[in-house]
């Protein structure tokens, strides 16, 4: 029995995309032990996925804690590392493992024993890149996020009386404020949807509080799921929604993975070929500055895409 370590940190969108290859890896190594190295904020996500024999936390802190993590990994006597993060930090880890062990390493870094070299000019999407990487190990890939396991907490659709509804995802992390379309614009979209007898459902969590409160102050006829929209609920809603509109943020990847048609509002800080969700159900409007995107332009896009 082999011991296999996956490494995955990053944003929620990265984590959601990585479930595609994590599922492929699990199907391939059916008789082996699989561990994952991740940050504390995604511990529960991977615990609920229920694929791993051990979850090891690496919050990427100071040198002393990092040494402790590396020692822990050495003690596990790992046979194969599959680096799904491919960062400068994990490249350092690979360098150390190459010096002091015979562990096989699959990744994009120069110290990988089974290295995937990608075209840096025409970079693949996250899912395609990771899929290409693990195919070097002989793993068959499906290239689709694996998320059906999320549906544990059931959403009560009686709350919306069988109305047609549309998901509104106005949030974004504070550090990515340049990817955030103004809340007042989302409020106008909500008003427009109401005029078409389509219920806007607003999703979001703590970081989105200010934006959601502003929307609610301008348009009250919405279903407000602020702090009531965990990933499983978003996934269920996405499967039945007419569509969704969103900034470039983690939940957009989840919505797109459900098959829901989603229209993204983007600035030049979003790479449409590599970072945003890919698929025929994903469309976008993009300008250098996101604040220059007009509500009227988005409404026209929604009419064309969703026949509202």
Language model features by range: what are they?
Residues 1-308:
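Catalytic machinery of carbohydrate-active enzymes
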């Amino acid at each position: 029995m082999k011991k296999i370590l996956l490494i995955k940190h990053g944003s929620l969108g990265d984590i959601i995309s990585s479930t595609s290859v994590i599922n492929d890896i699990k199907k391939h190594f059916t008789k082996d032990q699989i561990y994952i190295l991740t940050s504390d904020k995604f511990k529960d996500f991977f615990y609920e996925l229920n694929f791993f024999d051990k979850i090891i936390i690496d919050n990427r802190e100071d040198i002393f804690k990092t040494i402790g993590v590396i020692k822990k990994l050495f003690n596990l006597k790992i046979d194969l590392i599959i680096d799904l993060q491919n960062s400068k930090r994990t490249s350092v880890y690979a360098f150390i493992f190459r010096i002091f062990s015979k562990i096989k390493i699959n990744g994009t870094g120069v110290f990988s024993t089974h290295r995937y070299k990608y075209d840096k000019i025409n970079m693949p999407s996250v899912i395609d890149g990771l899929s290409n990487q693990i195919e070097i190990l002989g793993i068959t890939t499906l290239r689709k996020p694996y998320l059906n396991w999320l549906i544990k907490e059931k959403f009560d659709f009686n709350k919306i009386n069988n109305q047609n509804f549309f998901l509104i995802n106005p949030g974004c992390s504070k550090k990515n404020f340049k990817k955030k379309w103004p809340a007042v614009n989302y409020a106008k979209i909500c008003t427009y949807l109401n005029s078409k007898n389509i219920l806007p459902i607003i999703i979001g969590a703590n970081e989105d509080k200010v934006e959601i409160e502003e929307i609610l102050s301008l348009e009250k006829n919405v279903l407000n799921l602020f702090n009531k929209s965990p990933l499983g609920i978003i996934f269920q809603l996405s499967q039945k929604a007419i569509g969704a509109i969103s900034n470039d943020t983690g939940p957009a990847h989840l919505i797109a993975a459900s098959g829901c048609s989603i229209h993204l509002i983007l600035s030049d800080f979003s790479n449409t070929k590599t970072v945003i969700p890919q698929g025929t159900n994903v469309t976008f409007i993009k300008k250098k500055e996101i604040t220059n995107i007009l509500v009227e332009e988005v409404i026209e896009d929604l009419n064309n895409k969703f026949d509202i």
